[in-house]
A protein has these predicted regions:
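Extracellular/periplasmic, surface-exposed regions of secreted and cell-surface proteins
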Residues: 10-14, 29
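Conserved ATP-binding subdomain of kinase catalytic cores across diverse folds
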Residues: 26-44, 49-180, 253, 264, ...
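Catalytic activation segment of kinase domains across protein kinase-like and atypical kinase folds
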Residues: 228-269
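Small/polar glycine-rich anion-binding or flexible loop at a beta-alpha turn
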Residues: 305-315
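ATP-dependent phospho-/nucleotidyl transfer catalytic cores
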Residues: 2-5, 21, 28-32, 55-56, ...
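Long, compositionally biased intrinsically disordered regions
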Residues: 356-359
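Active-site activation/catalytic loop segments of kinase-like enzymes and analogous catalytic loops
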Residues: 254-298, 314-333
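A short, low-complexity linker immediately N-terminal to eukaryotic Hanks-type protein kinase catalytic domains
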Residues: 13-23
Length: 372
């Protein structure tokens, strides 16, 4: 990834490339997310403070960031048109990216860094984790509404910016390769985790195989449906829009649902060391399922409804497998805070997946209750 010396002057100069006017005041580093580097930048203009989100895209992860931005701009403009067609102002209900001086929605910096800039949405907030079931239900509505607004978007027009992103068969192949190569000499210390992930390969690859057989349709999916990727209105608590659209691609509805559940309905944090705390919270599961399927049930096939619970298990296993694979490869993909951070994440996801297996019947019953 491109390394650049970050100073006030550097941040201001990048922002100016996006036509931002006013007096530069300061910036803050945003720490959410594992992939991109993000800053909240403040300018004073027209008697008030204006804030922007400036991001440098991780070109190690996103090999073609131009295609990432084309996907994002196409999807956000489509959503904007859907909202406007209903007579509602779209200002706070969809992200707005700043065009650079050449009219493109990105700028390549002096050292090759790939930058973009969007407006912060006024009077909004996010939640990394919450026990508030009303907020969780709103998050479900937000992601369901995102897919509903894009139900007629031509999926074939989207670039696949990360090939095989949820190809769990290939994820297992990469895992086996990491175990075989053992490039950092870490495999001997995680033999138990390796064997447990191996034993769950069948269930983890079931949905991908269904899609290949034509039993599940590809749709526009977000592919990073964490609660902190939803903006909420500070006053009402209602959802405004979803953010962090880098991974918008063709995908399965159940994968978006499942990735949200593995994050929102985990009773512990993603890197919890005490695995006895790691459980699937069925109350949170139900709150999200109610919001998500309430928005989408009219456009879901029976197979899609039937595999939502399986999607939660699949995404939890896939995520944990990716953490373990990255740990074996030397932590080259996800940002880490300490040497065994990815290993702790992998263990946590495994514990959550095993608890999901024990509660699978309850999960399916809850989905059926709201999906109709």
């Amino acid at each position: 990834m491109i390394k650049e010396k970050i100073t006030n002057e550097f941040i201001e100069d990048i922002c100016r490339q996006f036509g931002i006017e006013g007096d530069f005041k300061y910036y803050e580093v945003l720490t959410n997310g594992h992939i991109n580097t993000s800053y909240k930048v403040f300018f004073y203009r027209d008697g008030e403070m204006k804030d922007y989100c400036l991001q440098r895209i991780n070109s190690y992860v996103f090999k073609n960031p131009v295609e990432v931005m084309e996907n994002i701009s196409n999807v956000t403009e489509y959503i904007r048109s859907v909202i406007k067609s209903s007579g509602i102002t779209a200002k706070r209900l969809v992200l707005h990216f700043q065009a650079a001086q050449d009219g493109k929605y990105y700028y390549i910096g002096p050292n090759g860094g790939f930058w973009r800039c969007s407006r912060f949405i006024d009077e909004s907030e996010t939640f990394n984790q919450t026990d508030n079931l009303a907020i969780i239900e709103e998050a479900g509505k937000a992601f369901g509404d995102f897919q509903l607004k894009l139900v007629d978007f031509p999926v074939k027009n989207l670039y696949i910016t990360i090939p095989h992103f949820h190809n769990t068969i290939m994820r297992y192949e990469a895992f086996y390769e990491a175990v075989k190569n053992d490039s950092c000499g870490r495999a001997s210390g995680v033999k138990e985790e390796i064997e447990r992930y191996k034993s769950l390969e069948g269930v983890a690859t079931e949905m991908y195989k269904m899609q290949r057989r034509g039993e599940l349709p590809l749709k526009v999916t977000h592919n990073d449906t964490k609660c902190n990727n939803v903006l909420f209105d500070k006053s009402t608590g209602e959802y405004l829009c979803v953010i962090d659209l880098d991974t918008v691609m063709p995908g399965l509805v159940g994968f978006d649902f499942g990735d949200a559940i593995r994050f929102i309905a985990n009773s512990a944090k993603e890197d919890e060391k005490d695995l006895s705390k790691v459980k699937l919270d069925l109350n949170k599961f139900e709150a999200f399922a109610k919001g998500f399927t309430g928005k989408l049930k009219s456009v879901l096939s029976e197979n899609e409804k039937d595999t939502l619970a399986l999607g939660a298990l699949t995404m939890t296993l896939e995520c944990g497998l990716r953490f373990l694979t990255d740990y074996l490869n030397g932590d080259v993909y996800f940002k880490t805070c300490y040497e065994e951070h990815n290993l702790d994440r992998a263990r946590c996801q495994l514990a959550l997946a095993e608890d999901m297996i024990s509660k699978r019947n309850e999960m399916k019953a809850i989905v059926a209750k709201y999906a109709g």
